[in-house]
Structures are given as structure tokens and as C-alpha cells.
Amino acid sequence: MHKKGSAMDQVFIRDLVARGIIGINDWEREKPQEILINIVLFADLREAGNSDNIRDGVNYRTVAKKVLAHSEAAQRHTVEALAADVARLCLEEPGVQKVRVRVEKPGAVRFSRSVGVEIERTKSELE
């Protein structure tokens, strides 16, 4: 577990692509669209590094599956709400003390690659 004063390591999931209903406009809610999600999980990974056992670390595959399932089913209106959902899911994982979540909607605004939000949350904010 993370101890006060010790450094937090980072586990990341980069460019996770979900397809889900997201948006405030009627046309955005007609069919699933691409949602791009980036996650940085902050945890003390020293024990996992020493033991070489995934049970002592953060299983990014488990996190990715939960995030994909939620993102594809949630039908949120805003990227802010989806980002908050993802942050909560991540902070439920054992050992994760802080999370940074970026949710983007590629092609949502003309002449831009994507738009979105990036948030940070800590486990203590959920307690």
C-alpha cells in the first residue's frame, strides 16, 4: 500500500477505444460513437516489482475491461460525467490512490482532431 511520503508509481492505459452513446444532441444519441480514453493509475508498485506477482500490482487488463463495459453501456450526456464514472471505477481497484482520466470525442468539433476533458481524483475524495 502507499505510505505517506513514498513515491507513487504510474500504470497507464493509453488510447483505449470504446464505442458508446455520448452527447447532448439528438444526432449524437442515435448511434454509438468512438470515445477515446486515457488513464493513469497512481499506486505504490514496489511490492509488485519485488514479487513479480500481478496480485501485488494493478491489473490494467481488469481495469480496461471494466472501463470499456461501463463506457459502452452508460449513455452519458457529457464527457465530464463519463470521466467521473471512469475515475470512480479506477479508484475502486486495490492499491490505486489517485487517477488521471482523459475522455475525448474524436471528430466532435469540425477542424479538430478531438475534444474532451481531463480530470484527477484521489481515493480520499471518494471516502
Q: Where are the predicted features?
A:
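N-terminal, polar/charged subdomain of small-to-medium soluble alpha/beta proteins
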Residues: 2-127
